[in-house]
């Protein structure tokens, strides 16, 4: 396949055109006075959204070189969205400003590699400044504020704050579509695994078709149990202390299952057999989680333990176990608190180091199950387009609220970035051209406030000057501009706040991608194939 190439200034200009197209579409959504964007779909109603990353992902340009620039800017929004779920429009606005200012410097003869080095030093100073002024999120009202700002809806803010308070900061909160038009909440106490009873003969509550065991002992193994001889020793020992026994194994079938069912029907033992959740290595990890939560021992041949060696001390304990045909819930496991906390910290460390989104999601699920909090938020609306748009806002607000709890909050409305500009005065540069990188970020940090004002129909430069003057006069760094009311005042008092993690990620991702773009010297793309037009079929001699 033959290629076409662009070099030097031509290459960078082509990238800039792509960046500008995406940024101009995305930045109209910034802030509470931002506009919606309507996206055409091949089938059904168009998607109407206020979400920057959704808009960015839909843009595909005809020119391959411009499309490269567009894709790079989409990467800024996507990366920010993946990490924190919000701040995508801010990141896009910052990246566009850095690219535009940087290309001017490069065209004037500055060294792009040194500009990038200056940008990297500058972003470190900004991140350190943001972290130093962070205000910890302490109560439900703070979480409600943060979520309400992200979703542009106070009802969603209150709902998320209530659910987060209930399940804790490590809890899993999933967002689903509801059949009705209102919001619904569902909570699951204890650890829930997505496997039900192996046989309906284990059911103790026929009305609800559930097996309920009070204060049971729990045998946990990764082995398949087919022969009753495998578990007979531990069954005999367990029967001396309890009748209630739960077996969680890879599978229970054949003679072993038949014996358990017969003895259950006779009333000799109140047993429940459940298949182990997950697959492969994840299954072993989840079984180990259950063992730690219940204070039991995972019986596995990998660690030199056979089933016939199990004792009562190896069995886990819980206040209650409830199982239906699809799920099993372990309520109030009797495991050692220190061991559970250590396991939680271990999973947290794995979440920080993993590079796979799928693995991260599964680890967070495990974390929540150990911490004992799972909730489902069901979003309802009158029409499907409204439902999809509302669900998207709830997901964004949820991510934002989590970020706020994690790293704290700063004044919103672009104030935190504006206040971080003086930190750039302390950046030590080695070469003259590195100063240009610092200057570029200095100008870019004003851009979010400028764009917020622009979307509200105000002059951005006038708003920034007024904010700076009022901050100096009143000696209050929290003063900013409320674009909804048109008032100047303390952003914290007005409840206009941003999570530090969102603001930090937006700056870091914008600088990262913009730096790559500025240091690009050549572009390579396929030459588009010209497809011949399809010939018009003949009439076939028929006379109409």
Curated annotation (Swiss-Prot):
EC numbers on record: 5.6.1.7
Keyword terms, alphabetized: ATP-binding, Chaperone, Cytoplasm, Isomerase, Nucleotide-binding
GO biological process: protein refolding
Reaction it catalyzes: ATP + H2O + a folded polypeptide = ADP + phosphate + an unfolded polypeptide
Source organism superkingdom: Bacteria
InterPro entries per UniProt: Cpn60/GroEL (IPR001844), Cpn60/GroEL/TCP-1 (IPR002423), GroEL-like_apical_dom_sf (IPR027409), GROEL-like_equatorial_sf (IPR027413), TCP-1-like_intermed_sf (IPR027410)
Keyword Iron: no
Gene Ontology CC: cytoplasm
Pfam families: Cpn60_TCP1
Chief localization: cytoplasm
Binding site for ATP: 29-32, 86-90, 413, 482-484, 498
NCBIfam families linked: GroEL (TIGR02348), PRK00013.1 (NF000592), PRK12849.1 (NF009487), PRK12850.1 (NF009488), PRK12851.1 (NF009489)
Its biological purpose: Together with its co-chaperonin GroES, plays an essential role in assisting protein folding. The GroEL-GroES system forms a nano-cage that allows encapsulation of the non-native substrate proteins and provides a physical environment optimized to promote and accelerate protein folding.
Alphabetized HAMAP family for the sequence: CH60 (MF_00600)
Assembly and oligomerization: Forms a cylinder of 14 subunits composed of two heptameric rings stacked back-to-back. Interacts with the co-chaperonin GroES.
Family from the record: Belongs to the chaperonin (HSP60) family.
Name by which UniProt lists this protein: Chaperonin GroEL 2
Species of origin: Roseiflexus sp. (strain RS-1)
Gene name of the encoded protein: groEL2
């Amino acid at each position: 396949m033959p290629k076409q190439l662009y070099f030097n200034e031509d290459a960078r200009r082509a990238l800039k055109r792509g960046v500008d197209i995406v940024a101009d579409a995305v930045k109209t959504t910034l802030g509470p006075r931002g506009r919606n964007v309507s996206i055409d779909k091949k089938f059904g109603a168009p998607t109407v959204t206020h979400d920057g990353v959704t808009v960015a992902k839909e843009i595909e340009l005809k020119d391959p070189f411009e499309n490269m620039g567009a894709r790079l800017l989409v990467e800024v929004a996507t990366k920010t969205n993946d990490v924190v779920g919000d701040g995508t429009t801010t990141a896009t606005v910052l990246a566009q400003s850095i690219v535009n200012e940087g290309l001017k410097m490069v065209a004037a003869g500055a060294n792009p590699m040194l500009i990038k080095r200056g940008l990297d030093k500058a972003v470190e100073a900004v991140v350190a400044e943001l972290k130093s002024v962070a205000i910890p999120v302490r109560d439900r009202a703070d979480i409600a504020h943060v979520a309400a700002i992200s979703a542009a809806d106070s009802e969603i803010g209150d709902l998320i704050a209530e659910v987060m308070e209930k399940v804790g900061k490590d809890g899993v909160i999933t967002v689903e579509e509801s059949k009705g038009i209102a919001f619904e909440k569902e909570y699951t106490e204890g650890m829930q695994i997505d496997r039900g009873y192996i046989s309906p003969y284990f059911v103790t509550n026929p009305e609800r078709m559930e097996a309920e065991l009070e204060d049971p002992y729990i045998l946990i193994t990764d082995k398949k149990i087919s022969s009753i001889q495998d578990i007979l020793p531990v069954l005999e020992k367990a029967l001396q202390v309890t009748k209630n026994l739960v077996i969680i194994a890879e599978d229970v079938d054949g003679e072993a299952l038949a014996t358990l069912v017969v003895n259950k029907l006779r009333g000799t033992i109140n047993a429940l057999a459940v298949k182990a959740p997950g697959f492969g290595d994840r299954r072993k990890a989840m079984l180990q989680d259950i063992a730690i939560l219940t204070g039991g021992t995972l019986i596995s041949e990998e660690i030199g333990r056979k089933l016939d060696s199990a004792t009562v001390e190896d069995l886990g304990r819980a206040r209650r176990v409830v199982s239906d045909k699809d799920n099993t819930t372990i309520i109030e496991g009797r495991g050692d608190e220190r061991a559970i906390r250590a396991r939680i910290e271990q999973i947290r460390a794995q979440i920080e180091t993993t590079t796979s989104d799928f693995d991260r999601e599964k680890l967070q699920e495990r974390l929540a199950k150990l911490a004992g909090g799972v909730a489902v938020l069901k979003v309802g609306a009158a029409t499907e387009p409204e439902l999809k748009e509302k669900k998207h806002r709830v997901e964004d607000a949820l991510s934002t609220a989590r970020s706020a709890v994690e790293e704290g909050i700063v004044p919103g409305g672009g104030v935190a970035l504006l206040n971080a500009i003086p930190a750039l005065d302390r950046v030590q540069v080695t070469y003259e051209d590195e100063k240009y990188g610092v200057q570029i970020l200095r100008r870019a940090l004003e851009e979010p406030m400028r764009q917020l004002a622009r979307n509200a129909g105000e002059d951005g430069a006038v708003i920034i000057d007024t904010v700076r003057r009022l901050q100096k006069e009143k000696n209050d760094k929290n003063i900013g501009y409320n674009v909804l009311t048109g008032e100047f005042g303390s952003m914290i008092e007005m409840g206009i706040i941003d999570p530090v993690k969102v603001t930090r990620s937006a700056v870091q991702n914008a600088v990262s991608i913009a730096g790559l773009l500025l240091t690009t010297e050549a572009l390579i793309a396929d030459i588009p194939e010209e497809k011949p037009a399809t010939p018009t079929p003949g009439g076939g001699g028929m006379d109409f």
